[in-house]
């Protein structure tokens, strides 16, 4: 099948934002204007096309990032047709993992900001994630029609809070109730959309005289910013020569793709104004798959570095970025094709698991509608049905030209709850349901508690686990009773020690003998566990090093003080001895475990707890009560700011003290304060609190 759209006219973009910035409404308008959906879906009516899970329509928030393909010929309908693949990403902090995995496979993003709320805590998180993956972006300041809308303030916040380099390419005509359209600073024209036709038609007119001076100043700023990023434009600018719109747009495109500049647009998605021009900006300023550097990976056979270009003639390579269970076709694996072509019915390699996979059917998704296609090409985003071994973050590639793309990193869960099915008959169904949900979501874990036999589920926050339990009921028909949330404590050591682990057992016949000397050292927070072999002269043979490490790992899992996993520790085996007959892998595994436990007990072991960054926005009159309450929760104040007629309080609070905070903050402020919280770091638990936790764990 020949390509209908050249790859240069592809745009793989994400829409990223804070929870109430109007991101899903913006996506709905994009789908409407590009002709995919004929009736606009409204979030507040629960009909939005992208929010296709029942819980999303009830809660009005986007949980899973649905992938959608649409086509655009420009606002005036005169351009060559471009293909835009959009990933809608959730804005709630418990779902940052969804955002992270979407950004990994995108080429560009549209960051949506609320003209009233501006840069919110979640905007900062998502922006940092986009920086990590070097995703070029444009900004769309939405909700310009709302009370309190202020375009300039949001632009300033993008510069100060996000440390971006925002360059407005539009100005709003009016704000709040008076918002009627935008000024295009490239053409120096005002654009007005026809309300009666839901914004599908527009007129270009002269700039209103009252705004002419502002527009000229803003254009001057825009041209200077572009000149700063582009030598050719700078030369013309300094010489006082005329710079054409085409030259300015080409230079701004280059600066956006390099990450030097963020073009800023504005509008009101709800009022059908501005999204059409933002789509033009996606074409003008965001990269196609060939504008960004080719994808890099390694040869799984020899570790050599390999590069794959975004070209149909290259060997096939793709990254699975999401697993979803569809009620009609079963398991769907969403993947982004970086190079080559994949045909339905062909077999590919999953190098990370060394498994071959047959691709049954390939589907292109429009929210939760599916269209079966015969093949996917470089730059495409699609979903495959029936893959057995692929998990989120796995590479899929050509059998004969293998490549392993860089793995995705997923955060460790910070909160646990015990779940039990309401009826014994549901026990097995619950196991299957949780297994499927864990395969879809790498930040969600399931395990069985060895002592109590309870099923423990872990995730990134209370809402995350609530939605998992809700999905079990809706999608798998399993009702569960949920225990009180438990904090995921960790343990670590504070000083370097050396310790001996010796396991000798003699009871007639062959004995057991394992003997090791270990050095335990504390590591920087977030380093995890490192094991090194420092044995010289063969005092411990090579075949017993691995079992020793396994023994240490088992001891790590069971903790030192209160049974919580030990982190940020380096263990080096540097000496020991063995017996020709009696030594075995099992004996060295036990010796490793004994050596670690003995050493850790002497190495100043401490408890660590997850600390959350909390931001509360409250009317000033409730500030004293809210700060007092934060202090009573062992909170540490980080600062305060004025925020649109209210106060923004920034603090860090242990997760253990935050359960039920939503109710408290509502009652303290008569429902007028709002808060967000997200995991920040692990810190040592104060002595008196640690004692209580240890006592509780020993019961």
Swiss-Prot record:
One of its GO terms (molecular function) is GTP binding. Gene3D superfamilies: 3.30.230.10, 3.30.70.240, Elongation Factor G (Translational Gtpase), domain 3, P-loop containing nucleotide triphosphate hydrolases, Translation factors. The keyword Metal-binding does not apply. GO terms for cellular component: cytoplasm. Residues 8-290 form the tr-type G domain. Keywords: Cytoplasm, Elongation factor, GTP-binding, Nucleotide-binding, Protein biosynthesis. InterPro entries: EF-G-like_DII, EFG_II, EFG_III, EFG_III/V, EFG_IV, EFG_V, EFG_V-like, G_TR_CS. One of its GO terms (biological process) is ribosome disassembly. It is found in: Cytoplasm. Coiled coil: none annotated. GTP binds at residues 17-24, 88-92, 142-145. SUPFAM superfamilies: EF-G C-terminal domain-like, P-loop containing nucleoside triphosphate hydrolases, Ribosomal protein S5 domain 2-like, Translation proteins. Catalyzes the GTP-dependent ribosomal translocation step during translation elongation. During this step, the ribosome changes from the pre-translocational (PRE) to the post-translocational (POST) state as the newly formed A-site-bound peptidyl-tRNA and P-site-bound deacylated tRNA move to the P and E sites, respectively. Catalyzes the coordinated movement of the two tRNA molecules, the mRNA and conformational changes in the ribosome. Belongs to the TRAFAC class translation factor GTPase superfamily. Classic translation factor GTPase family. EF-G/EF-2 subfamily. NCBIfam families: EF-G, PRK12740.1-5, small_GTP. This is Elongation factor G. The lineage of its organism: Bacteria, Pseudomonadati, Pseudomonadota, Acidithiobacillia, Acidithiobacillales.
């Amino acid at each position: 099948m020949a390509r209908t759209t050249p790859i240069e006219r592809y745009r793989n973009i994400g829409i990223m934002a804070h929870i109430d910035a109007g991101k899903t409404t913006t996506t709905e308008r994009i789908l409407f204007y590009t002709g995919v959906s004929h009736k606009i879906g409204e979030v507040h009516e629960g009909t939005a096309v992208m929010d296709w899970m029942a819980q999303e329509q009830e809660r009005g928030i986007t949980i899973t990032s649905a992938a959608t393909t649409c086509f655009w010929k420009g606002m005036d309908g005169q351009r060559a047709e471009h293909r835009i693949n959009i990933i809608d990403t959730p804005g709630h902090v418990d779902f940052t993992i969804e955002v992270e995995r979407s950004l990994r496979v995108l080429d560009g993003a549209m960051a949506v900001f609320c003209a009233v709320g501006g840069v919110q805590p979640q905007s900062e998180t998502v922006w940092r994630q986009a920086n990590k993956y070097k995703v070029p972006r444009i900004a769309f300041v939405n909700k310009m029609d709302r009370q309190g809308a202020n375009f300039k303030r949001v632009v300033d916040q993008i510069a100060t809070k996000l440390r971006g380099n925002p360059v407005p390419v539009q100005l709003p005509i009016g704000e709040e109730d008076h918002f009627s359209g935008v000024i295009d600073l490239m053409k120096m024209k005002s654009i007005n959309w026809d309300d009666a036709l839901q914004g599908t038609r527009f007129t270009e007119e002269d700039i209103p005289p009252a705004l002419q001076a502002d527009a000229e100043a803003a254009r001057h700023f825009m041209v200077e910013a572009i000149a700063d990023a582009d030598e050719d434009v700078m030369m013309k600018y300094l010489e006082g020569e005329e710079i054409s719109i085409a030259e300015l747009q080409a230079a701004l495109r280059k600066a956006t793709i390099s990450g030097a500049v963020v073009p800023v647009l504005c509008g009101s998605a709800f009022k059908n104004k501005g999204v059409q021009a933002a789509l033009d900006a996606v074409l003008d300023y965001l990269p196609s798959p060939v504008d960004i550097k080719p994808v890099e990976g390694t040869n799984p056979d020899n570790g050599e570095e390999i590069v794959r270009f975004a070209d149909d003639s290259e060997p096939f390579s793709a990254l699975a970025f999401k697993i979803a269970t569809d009620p009609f076709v079963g398991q769907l694996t969403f993947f982004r094709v970086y190079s080559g072509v994949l045909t339905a019915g062909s077999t590919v390699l999953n190098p990370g698991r060394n498994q071959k996979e047959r691709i049954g059917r390939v589907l292109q998704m429009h929210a939760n509608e599916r269209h079966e296609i015969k093949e996917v090409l470089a730059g495409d985003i699609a979903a495959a049905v029936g893959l057995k071994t692929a998990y989120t973050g796995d590479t899929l590639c050509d059998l004969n030209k293998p490549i392993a793309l860089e793995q995705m990193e997923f955060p460790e869960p910070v909160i646990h709850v015990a779940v039990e099915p309401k009826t014994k008959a549901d026990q097995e169904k619950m196991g299957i349901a949780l297994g499927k949900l864990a395969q879809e979501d790498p930040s969600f874990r399931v395990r069985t508690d060895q002592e109590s036999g309870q099923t423990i589920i872990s995730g990134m926050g209370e809402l995350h686990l609530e939605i998992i339990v809700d999905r079990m009921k809706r999608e798998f028909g399993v009702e569960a009773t949920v225990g009180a949330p438990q904090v995921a404590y960790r343990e670590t050591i504070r000083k370097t020690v050396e310790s001996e682990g010796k396991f000798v057992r003699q009871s007639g016949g062959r004995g057991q003998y394992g003997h090791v000397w270990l050095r335990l050292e504390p590591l920087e927070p977030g380093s995890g566990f490192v094991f090194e072999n420092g044995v010289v002269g063969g005092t411990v043979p090579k075949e017993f090093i691995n079992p020793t490490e396994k023994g240490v790992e088992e001891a790590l899992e069971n903790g030192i003080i209160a049974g919580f996993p030990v982190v940020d520790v380096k263990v080096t085996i540097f000496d020991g001895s063995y017996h020709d007959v009696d030594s075995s892998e099992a004996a060295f595994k036990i010796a490793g475990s004994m050596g670690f436990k003995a050493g850790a007990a002497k190495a100043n072991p401490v408890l660590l707890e997850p600390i959350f960054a909390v931001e509360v926005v409250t009317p000033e009159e409730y500030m004293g009560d809210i700060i007092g309450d934060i202090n009573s929760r062992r909170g540490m104040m980080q600062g305060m700011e004025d925020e649109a007629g209210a106060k923004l309080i920034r603090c860090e609070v242990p997760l253990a003290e935050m359960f039920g905070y939503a109710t408290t903050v509502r009652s303290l402020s008569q429902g007028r304060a709002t808060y967000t919280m997200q995991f920040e770091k692990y810190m040592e638990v104060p002595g008196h609190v640690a004692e209580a936790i240890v006592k509780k764990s020993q019961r």
